[in-house]
Amino acid sequence: FTQPLSQFAQAFQNLQRCAAAAERVFGFLEEPEMEDESGKSALLGANGHEVKGDVEFSHVQFGYEPGKPIIHDFSASVKAGQKVAIVGPTGAGKTTMVNLLMRFYEISGGSIAIDGVDTKSVPRWNVHDQFSMVLQDTWVFRGTVRENIAYSKPGVTNKQIEDACKAVGLDHFIRSLPDGYDTVLDDKSSLSQGQKQLLTIARAMVQDAPILILDEATSSVDTRTEELIQKAMDALTVGRTSFVIAHRLSTIRDADMILVMNHGDVIERGTHDELLAAGGFYADLYNSQFALAD
């Protein structure tokens, strides 16, 4: 006689899950349409002009809700080819700043320019084309290794794919697979987290965009794998402007500029040595990490 009760309880749980999913779906459908940008004729990299990667933040302000700013007045000038690290506690605004740079959200005030061109004056797709991303949460879709790496770059050659894999130290592993570069992968493939991140780095290298976003790319792997990934990162960042978001401060000592954020504001900036010498928030954060490691 308990079976009907169990079935009723199971049905009730399913209804609860459906209600939660429906709320998210309808919330998405009710979002306002994005602005029509078909009238924007300016393009980054148009007329054969290569995008160098100079980035200028000028008095940027942003809040997810009106009247509740989380980034109050952010300004920074980044030269082409520089490596910029953004550090700070959880909720400081690090990832939000990168999302604004790529125009995933519109800023409330100020401006963001790439090579002197305000990103608001060009279509979003054109802004997105200037970036490659390597995220902590890597993804692999069902397809061959070759297809996974070439995903972001239509028309890429086999040689470019293999050269990228050699540069990140993944070529030997791929050739040990049953079908090499033609081995079919999916989310359940027996790739380690580190191998997935190396594949993502190879994908970004093939894309060859002038600006890189490296978000928490080494925070979930062991020390040896982190070293391999760091070498691949170093190869990837050569000649490109890069923004690195990391909690492991040991990985960004060589950054040209470190922006220390807290509560949406840049409270310190400088090189690793300059910030340590200043003995401020960054120095406390850095020393606390190594005290925990000891």
Each model region followed by its residue ranges:
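Cytosolic ends of transmembrane helices, especially the final helix of ABC transmembrane type-1 domains
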Residues: 1-28
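Conserved E/DxxT/N motif and adjacent residues on the DHp alpha2 helix
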Residues: 27, 34, 150
